[in-house]
Amino acid sequence: VMYGVIDFYREAKKQGINPILGCEVYVAPNSRFDREITGGDDRYYHLVLLAENEEGYANLTKIVSKGFVEGYYYKPRVDKELLRKYHKGIIALSACLAGEVARFLTKGLYEEAKKTALEYQEIFGEGNFFLELQDHGIPEQQNVNQQLLRMHQETGIDLVATNDIHYT
């Protein structure tokens, strides 16, 4: 959700900070309109979206709003159709272990993960999708990071180091 983003933006600017506005969204495995429960952890995937400019902020608000209005099923969900429609001005990160790319990697499905990463790069454009490295000392995460490094070398998709933090 993006509640409070305007107050946050104004206060950051007042303090001389250039804020980066964004949101972690839930991506439905198929359509945001689906109301069927899929098994296990694959009910939705995490994806980080950051507004690159004013157009990106406008598109981000549309994506998030439509996730609530059209895709709400236990959680507000978006889908790749929506991301394709409103991708301009948005930078996307592959997210944590709950992201689609990482989920495939933890299941040993490297080629499917790579295909998914390339699909996100196609949606957001080269230079606007990043593979997200995190290290919280979790063995599974360290394994995923090694595979993301390999994927970077094979695809040229850039890496970004982050931490799984949430601002409320």
Give the ranges of each region predicted by the language model.
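Phosphodiester-processing cores and adjacent nucleic acid-binding clamps
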Residues: 1-168
